[in-house]
Structure formats: C-alpha cells, structure tokens
C-alpha cells in the first residue's frame, strides 16, 4: 500500500488533504466490497436466497456432501494415473454481444453444483496411494468485471461453498493440466456435442484452450460420459425430489392451460413458459412444441407461429426444469374441448398403448427400454387395425410411429444418451413413455385420419414391482380432458 501511495503522490503532486481523501476513499470502498463479497457468491446460497435453498443445500434439494459423494464414486472408477478434465459450459451468443441464458454443463454440474462459467474440475488418480486429487479452478474476484457480469465466488469462498479443499484461481489451471497430462495413462474429457466434438478444446474456457490443444495432439482422450452416464442414470433420493417437483409443477400447468382457449400457438407457448416459472420451476426444460392440427406431423415442431382451428387438436410437448432436473410431458387435446369420433378413436388407441407400456417399467420384468419399444410397435399395430388403419409393422415404424417409445431424463432432456438401451431397466432410472401416431396427408392412408398427430408422454420412475408416474396429474383420459372445458 505504501508503494501505491508514494507513486500516486509523486505522479499527481496531491496536497496532503487530497492525498488523505484518496486514501480514505480507496480504503473504505475496498473494505465495503470485500465485506459484501464475503456474504455473496457467484450463485445462490442458503443464506442469500432462503426462498430457493434450504439450510445445507448447495443446489435445490442437494447438499455439498452429495456432490462430494458423486466425486468419490467416479474416482473409484478411475485406474491408477487416470486424469479427468471436466469444464463448465461456455457462454453462448446469439450474435454479437447478445448472449443466451446460461446453462451449466450437466457433467460439471453433477460433480460440483457450480453454476459459474469459466471453471474447471480436475481429478487425478494417484498410482502409489490409490487416493485421488481433486481441484476446482474458478474465476478470480474482480470488482470491475463483477459490476458488469455479476458476482463471482472466487477461490476463498469456493472452498467453503463447494466443500472442495483445493480451490484455486483459474489462471493456475493450465500449468496443472500440463503437468498431470504428462504423467497420465488415460485422459477423460467432457466433449461437447455437434461440430465442437471435432475440436474438443474449442468449448473449453479460453484460459486452457491452448494447453488442451497441445495435450490432445500427443494423447488419446476418452469421454467422461462413459464414467458419468452410468452413475447419473440411477437417481438419488434428492434427485428424485427435484424431478418430482418439476413434474408436479409442470403437470398442474398443463391442467390450467387445458382449461383455457387460445387463438394462436405462440400464445399457448408463451403461457407454458410463463406458468412454469411462476409455478416454481427455473425455466422451461426445452423449447415447447405447440403444434395445432397437421403441424404435429413434424415431431419437433417448435416454430409455434400458426393459428388454431376449432375442429383440430393441439399436440404439446413441454416441461419445466427444477434445480437443473427436467420433466418431459406430451399431451394432445381438441381445441374446442370435445373429441370428434375419429379423434376419440385414434387418441384412445395411442393411450391404450401408452398405459400398457408404462406397466412394463419395473425391474421385475427384466425388460430394457428397447424391449418396451418393440412391444409398443406390436401394440400400436393391433390398436390401429381395430380402428381401421391397416399397415405393416415396417410402415408403422417408418411412417406412423417413427420414434422410440422413450428415453432417459434427468439433468438433460435426453439424459445419459451413451447408455445402452438394450440393458435391463434399473430401479430409480427415470424414463419417458411416449408412443405417437402421425398420419401423413398421403395416398394410401385413410382420408378421415390424414393430418392427425397424437403423442402422449409421461415421465416415469422405474420401480421394482411397479412404476411411479411422475406426471400423472397432467390430464390424459378423454373424459377428464373434456370435463376441463365444460
């Protein structure tokens, strides 16, 4: 401090009074900042946001101890001298300076509970002792940047918040990666999907990109997914509580929206996004599908810019996210509140398939998700024959019902995507069951059915002897749906 004052005095030739004023201003503004930073981190805490977090929670429903247990579990899967590098998600921009809402990388979040960008988790399995080293690298405290971008946790507060002993400034990460990379046998890294998978370092924080690029030129990397997806697949009690919360909120939103009348897809889409948030979710888990009439023939229809026509149905695929965990629901209902005879028959056919498939979601059957899908195709074939739609099983899977019966959900809407769908289901996996029917406007299919699209989807916890449907409060029985608009 004395050097700073001496330089300031010589350079600016302050009077004693002005120099004293500058010292006081500098001193107390800095102390004020430090006091505030000691109370507030780069994410919500149980002391600053008690309306979000209960005492002891690092993220909603989940404690720092549970995150440590997860790190211990993945460390037990590492071999001697294995090195794991898990980076936070990058900030993504729409264009120029306009950025998207930040969403953390699911693997990084699963292991740390940290919600900040530009962070790195390193884990190294010691060959001699069998123990593992774990270190977290966070952006340093910086009053100027925090004024623009929000608070940072920093290394000092990070040790206490995340209960990781070794938390350092992110500027130190490159040297550690370089040193550990040289003596590692296998390197695990969290590759991003899409084109970034061909440039693995491109999605990493800028301060380690050069280091990773050099390291990856001389080593072979494996995806952390092969270690983490099997662990993430089986949900803990706390994780299931998050998913129940997301499902309950989302199911109630469906019920309320089904009561109302809308003229435009955009209005209904906005209502879903709004109600998820005011109901207690963090955000929509994904861009809602709100498809009126034949728009539902596009399975991932998200443009949501058409008008509703009274004699048509609307297919909605939307769900909320709570504490990082998502729910996935699809419902189809008539715009005017009353199913026509054709709509009723086709809807009931799909519903029958869905309800039968849900019953298979238990470990006692020994079935895999693939087994349930193959059974759903058989059931769909039988149901459609009864209502007058005749097609081969190949035509059903290629045209009328071209997607799978379901997928895992959790921190991602298609969670643990590297898991083998042919493995028997395990207790506390959470999956979707979502048969669909999409009759194209083409010759060869009954005129009376053309343009009709139906999907019915629930989020389901796999049990030992019977499943638990998380989203059962979202109406799907015909009588219940019709009663909502009376």
From Swiss-Prot:
State the organism of origin.
Answer: Schizosaccharomyces pombe (strain 972 / ATCC 24843) (Fission yeast)
Locations listed in the record = Mitochondrion inner membrane
Q: Which UniProt keywords apply?
A: Aminopeptidase, Hydrolase, Manganese, Membrane, Metal-binding, Metalloprotease, Mitochondrion, Mitochondrion inner membrane, Protease, Transit peptide
Looking at its record, which EC class is this enzyme? hydrolase
The entry's Mn(2+) 2-binding residues are 317, 328, 457
Listed binding positions for Mn(2+) 1 are: 328, 407, 434, 457
EC numbers: 3.4.11.26
Gene3D superfamilies linked to this entry = Creatinase/methionine aminopeptidase superfamily, Creatinase/prolidase N-terminal domain
- Chain segment of the transit peptide: 1-19
The source's domain of life comes to Eukaryota
The family classification in the record reads: Belongs to the peptidase M24B family.
Topology in the lipid bilayer: Peripheral membrane protein
Q: What catalytic reaction does the record list? A: The enzyme cleaves the 36-Pro-Pro-37 bond of cysteine desulfurase (EC 2.8.1.7) removing three amino acid residues (Tyr-Ser-Pro) from the N-terminus after cleavage by mitochondrial processing peptidase
Which cofactors does this gene product need? Mn(2+)
User: What does the protein in this record do?
Assistant: Aminopeptidase which cleaves preprotein intermediates that carry destabilizing N-ter amino acid residues after the mitochondrial processing peptidase (MPP) cleavage site and is thus critical for stabilization of the mitochondrial proteome.
Q: Which CDD domains match?
A: Prolidase
One GO MF term on file is: metalloaminopeptidase activity
SMART domains for this protein? AMP_N
Task: Report the cofactor remark.
Answer: Binds 2 manganese ions per subunit.
- Which Gene Ontology cellular-component terms appear in the entry? mitochondrial inner membrane; mitochondrion
Query: Can you supply a Gene Ontology BP term from the record?
Result: proteolysis
A Pfam family that this protein carries is AMP_N
Mind telling me what this protein is named? Answer: Intermediate cleaving peptidase 55
